[in-house]
Amino acid sequence: MEKKENGLDGKQSGRVINGPTNPMVTPLLNDLYQFTMAYAYWKAGKQSERSVFDLYFRKNPFGGEYTIFAGLEECIKFLANFNLTDEEIDFVRDSLPGCEEAFCDYLRGLDCSDIEVYAISEGSVVFPKVPLLRIEGPVAVVQLLETPFLNLINYASLVATNAARHRFVAGKSKLLLEFGARRAQGPDGAISASKYCYLGGFDATSNVAAGKLFGIPLRGTHSHAFVSSFMSLDEIVDKVLRSSDGKSTCKDFICLVQTCLTKIQNSSSLQGIFSETNQSELAAFISYALAFPNSFLALVDTYDVMKSGIPNFCAVALALNELGYKAVGIRLDSGDLAYLSTEVRKFFCAIERDLKVPDFGKMIVTASNDLNEETVDALNKQGHEVDAFGIGTNLVTCYAQAALGCVFKLVEINNQPRIKLSEDVTKVSIPCKKRTYRLFGKEGYPLVDIMTGENEPPPKVGERLLCRHPFNESKRAYVVPQRVEELLKCYWRGNADEAREELEPLKELRNRCIKQLENMRPDHMRRLNPTPYKVSVSAKLYDFIHFLWLNEAPVGELH
């Protein structure tokens, strides 16, 4: 396959597609056996045979019954810029002792101008066995896409699903912040996690690089180190703060804060809760407020939450309020989050009531500290006053499940359907080039995803259709769809001038994810014993699967 202009420079129908986010995503991001197979195909004269591969997964992650599809954009960027440099070809030559120079010339001419990719829209809710991507093209080239595609989709879909599950358990009203950069598996793990957690429903990230690359909102304040770095109020040299409207100036903000702290101590509702607060902590809070008067949010558990952190924060927040600013809130990073958040809210509300400060009780309470799906669920059951959750380690590392397990299987070559058999029926592939549809019921929920042969007529609204389990003959049902949606759309058509789907902004992918999850039937979404979503094949495809299965399986002989 010769290099075409649109494959070489990432153009398709006049559009230029940038390369992958990570520059390490090159054709060498591959398993060696992809190159050994390419050489063997080439030696056998099979390298240009037209093949069809499906990329799919076999089981939903985290014990759930749904998955979020992510990573498609990076795959298309990889395709659009696919080519091997001379240096890379030299390395392949050295890695394949005895390979002919003509094979290196063949590699030098490769691009993806003869590849077609059909995919489900990124950000969609997807299910096992259904192809996420269908890749068509010369078999040797398609095999060189297998490892990069799996690498780009497996983690992206896994962490997006993890984020979606955290969003589901937290609820729509809570702010979810991804704090995982320091615990992620390397730089790319951190960047990818930030991107796909946002897609999966998180609101913001602490990762500045991800904010720059993808336009994700950034959130962050300070650490315990900032608080403990201060020793006394004497360290604050510049005590001046102009009012928010710029009309007046407070020449001694420290004095104003101390006055506010005394007011809190004398408040009828709060007497006896605290006495002397930690003055070095107060110095840290004042210093931070002077730097960020419009967005003051403090970490309050460095010393003691209720006896020091909260009174000190409230004193600074009241002082800011007198100058026309509104503090944002606090963060809790340790302790009993349900109890502490409730007590903090009571403290805020007492000040609002006693000192007549409007909306003081509505300030944000953020919780962090090794949170995960289970702990957020437990907090909900206990009752809490947390408005925002900062989640890191368990989210970005996908601690509950290490991998999604997407696979890349040949389903057709030279127009001949192929099947992969196994003693484990879950690993038997579904052969031939297929079309996939989502059928919706009367209540608007999706009922079933059905795969059909490429040339079968599509399901029609209002017409009764038999849906069969691919491998279990007793599992079957008639469906009368009220709406039919074809899932696989063309995202890459090589050197053809025909239309294809555009790559969408990350925010639109996020919106799709949120909307589709809202439209799922509740029993598919619940954490405990969710109902499996039905994935079926047409009656005609079912018959063909089992015909091919019997045809390819060797017949045993008993003696």
From Swiss-Prot:
Biological process (GO) annotations? NAD biosynthetic process
Q: Which reaction does it catalyse?
A: nicotinate + 5-phospho-alpha-D-ribose 1-diphosphate + ATP + H2O = nicotinate beta-D-ribonucleotide + ADP + phosphate + diphosphate
Claim: Transit peptide is one of the keywords in the record: no
Keywords on record: Glycosyltransferase, Ligase, Magnesium, Manganese, Metal-binding, Phosphoprotein, Pyridine nucleotide biosynthesis, Transferase
Against InterPro entries, the record matches this protein to: Aldolase_TIM, N/Namide_PRibTrfase, NAPRTase_C, NAPRTase_N, Nic_PRibTrfase-Fam, Nic_PRibTrfase_pncB, Nicotinate_pribotase-like_C
Which positions does the record annotate as the modified residue Phosphohistidine? H224
How is its cofactor bound, per UniProt? Answer: Activity is highest with Mn(2+).
**Entry-linked Pfam families:** NAPRTase (PF04095), NAPRTase_C (PF17956), NAPRTase_N (PF17767)
Reading the lineage from the top rank, the first entry is Eukaryota
Q: What class does this enzyme belong to in the EC scheme?
A: ligase
| Ligand binding (nicotinate) | Y33, T221, R331
Q: What does the UniProt induction comment state? A: Not regulated in the quinolinate synthase mutant old5 causing increased NAD steady state levels.
Task: List residues binding 5-phospho-alpha-D-ribose 1-diphosphate.
Answer: T393
Question: What does this gene product do?
Answer: Catalyzes the first step in the biosynthesis of NAD from nicotinic acid, the ATP-dependent synthesis of beta-nicotinate D-ribonucleotide from nicotinate and 5-phospho-D-ribose 1-phosphate. Helps prevent cellular oxidative stress via its role in NAD biosynthesis.
Protein name listed in UniProt: Nicotinate phosphoribosyltransferase 1
What organism does this protein naturally occur in?
A: Arabidopsis thaliana
